[in-house]
Every structure is written in C-alpha cells, then in structure tokens.
From Swiss-Prot:
Residues 17-326 are lumenal. Keywords: Endoplasmic reticulum, Membrane, Signal, Transmembrane, Transmembrane helix. The lineage of its organism: Eukaryota, Fungi, Dikarya, Ascomycota, Taphrinomycotina. Residues 116-176, 243-278, 289-322 have a biased composition (Low complexity). Its main location: endoplasmic reticulum. It is found in: Endoplasmic reticulum membrane. This is Uncharacterized protein C553.10. It is a single-pass membrane protein. It holds the Pfam family Kre9_KNH.
Length: 349
C-alpha cells in the first residue's frame, strides 16, 4: 500500500505544472514581446503569478510580471526596459508569494535589443490608461473553475500584455532610483560642552595624550579618567599621587572618588561624585581641544599671569614697606616741639 501511495505521488509530480518556454540558453531581447508557455493538469492551481528572477546577482532579484490564468497555457510579455544579463528564470508562483513556486523555467539570457519603432511606442503609451483596471483586477487570484476562466481569457489577453509594459516601465524607474547614491559632506563635530547623566566603562590603563575620555561615549575629548599611568592628560580623577598641572603622573583612583576642579593654570575639571558602579550620574564636563600647542600656550599664559601676579604682589609689598619707611623717616624736630609743648602745659596746670 505504501508503495502505491509513493508511486501515485511520483506520477502527480511528473504531471504537475511545468514551463516549456523559455528553455536553457535562450536569448530574449528587450525591444519587443516574448512568449511564456507552460503545461498544466486539472489538479493545478487555476491562477498563478509570473515572476522574473535574476540568479546572476546575490541576493537574487525577483520582479513581478503579471497574474495569469493557468488554463491558457501561454502568456505574451513585453520585455521593454527589462534588465540584461545572464542567469534569468521565469517562475510561476502563488500570487503575492514568490517563494511559493509552482513551476520554474530553465535559465536564459536577456540582451539589449534595437530601438522599437515610433508606432509601437505610441500604441504602447496609449494603452496605459485602459490597462489600469485590468491590471488591478488581475492582482488577486481567480476563484472560478478552469472552464469558466478559459472563456474570458481571450478577451483579457490584450489588456494583460499592455499592462505588463507599464509595470515593467515603472519597475525599471524604481530600479534606477534605488541605485542612486547620495553623497554626504564629511564634517568634524567637536562640541564645546559634554553633558552626561549616565556613562560607564571609563577605566583607562596606560593612557597617553588623552585621546579618549569616559570610555565608549567620550571620543576625541582630551581627558583621562581613572588612569593608572596618564601622560599629557588634561583631566584626571583624584588619586593617591596626582601632580597638579597638565601632566598627571601615577593617578591610580577608584570609581568612588570624584573629579575635582583645580585652578585654571592646572587644567582640571569639576563634575559631581561618581557612584560605586562607575557611572557618572550628573554633571557637565567641558571638552577641550586635543591640540598640545593650545595647552602649551595656555600654560605659558597661566605662567605669565602667575608671574605678573607675583610681580604685582612684590610691588605692593615694596610700596607698603616704603610708605612705612617714610612714616618712620619724618623729621625728628616736629616730634620734639610737640613733646616740649606737652610738658610745658602739664607744668602750668
């Protein structure tokens, strides 16, 4: 019994829907019409969708052609604006589901054909309006029997052939649009203020020149957070041995410490306290330039301002000393006269 069932299944598959044309190695041109032919049996689907599939590219490109009545056994398609190349195949599948294939043709080639005459192009353009209704109605699979659909197939053959022209034209234009590329101007983005609420992964070991700050989200910022050996870093986390200034030496800190703002000449930063899990919860960090020349200039400026401040302080000190000295160096005669009159007045009283 099992053998009989397997044999019947083999016969059914052999008699199922199959495509006769195009055959292997056929060459179709893009300047006219080509005919697709197939065989069906009474158990096959009453309608099927025709798809043009290109296996020469990856992933394969599937293009919808039309939905046909399978009992007709043939369909004439307009190949105008079809893609050219090798490895093309016609598939008959369930409408709207190109992966549910009923039958496949052998692979064939498509080449560029000569330009069509003006009369054929004008007739093709004039049939676009009349083919709109027929193409929309043929998009759904037929539910009638094969006998009733065969009587109406001859009347709708011309409208289907004309609608394929408009569909292939629109598909060609959509393909052209999809291959266009848009050029974008490259620009470097460097914000002056770097606000953050929750940033993790900011531990850095042996960081040089401070190109990365706060892990993944701090690219191109000149700061070193929680670094054990940071050279030429502008910012650092409070640690056991942090040297004030531009360079941070042997800054070994934990995530429980907070960033402290040093004087301007020390190039430091103020943020809020970090949590134990290593997330900076609140704060705003100023992003400085990574240009060492700018930092050197700032250090020179700060050094100059410190020198000028010390000079002004020494000048002020010297002026105070000179004014005190001038008070001491007043003429002694005036003091003596005042003392004499005071003694005389006391004796008189």
């Amino acid at each position: 019994m099992l053998f009989k069932i397997s044999f019947l299944a083999l016969i059914a598959s052999a008699l199922a829907m199959s495509i006769n044309s195009p055959t292997n190695g056929d060459t179709w041109q893009t300047n006219g019409e080509e005919q697709i032919t197939w065989n069906v049996v009474s158990t096959d689907e009453p309608s099927a969708a025709l798809y043009l599939t290109n296996f020469a590219v990856y992933p394969t490109v599937t293009q919808y052609l039309d939905t046909v009545d399978t009992s007709t056994g043939s369909y004439t398609t307009n190949t105008t604006n079809w893609p050219t190349g090798q490895g093309f195949q016609i598939n008959m599948a369930y409408p709207g589901r190109p992966e549910q294939i009923y039958a496949q043709s052998q692979q064939f080639n498509i080449v560029e054909g000569a330009a069509s005459s003006s009369s054929s192009s004008s007739s093709s353009s004039s049939s676009l309006v009349s083919s709109t209704t027929s193409s929309s109605s043929s998009a759904t699979p037929s539910t009638t029997s094969s006998s009733s659909s065969s009587s109406s197939s001859s009347s709708s053959s011309s409208s289907k052939s004309s609608s394929s022209s408009s569909k292939s034209s629109s598909r060609s234009s959509s393909r052209t649009t999809s291959h266009r590329t848009t050029s974008h101007k490259s620009s470097s983005y460097r914000p002056t203020v770097f606000p953050y609420t929750t940033i993790s992964h900011y531990n850095i070991t042996n960081a040089t020149n401070g190109t990365y700050c706060n892990g993944t989200n701090g690219t191109n910022f000149t700061c070193i957070v929680n670094a054990s050996n940071a050279t030429n870093s502008t910012f650092w986390l409070n640690g056991t041995n942090s040297t004030n200034g531009t360079n941070s030496t042997n800054s070994t800190s934990t995530t429980s410490h907070s960033l402290t703002k040093l004087p301007t000449s020390s190039k430091s930063l103020t943020t809020s306290k970090t949590t134990a899990s290593g997330h900076i919860t609140k704060g705003v960090m100023e992003a400085l330039s990574t240009n060492d020349t700018t930092n050197t200039t700032d250090d020179a400026t700060n050094t100059t301002s410190d020198s000028s401040s010390s000079s002004s302080a020494s000048a002020s000190s010297s002026s105070s000393s000179s004014s005190a000295a001038s008070l001491v160096s007043q003429p002694v005669g005036i003091s003596a006269v005042i003392a004499f009159f005071a003694v005389a007045l006391s004796l008189t009283l």
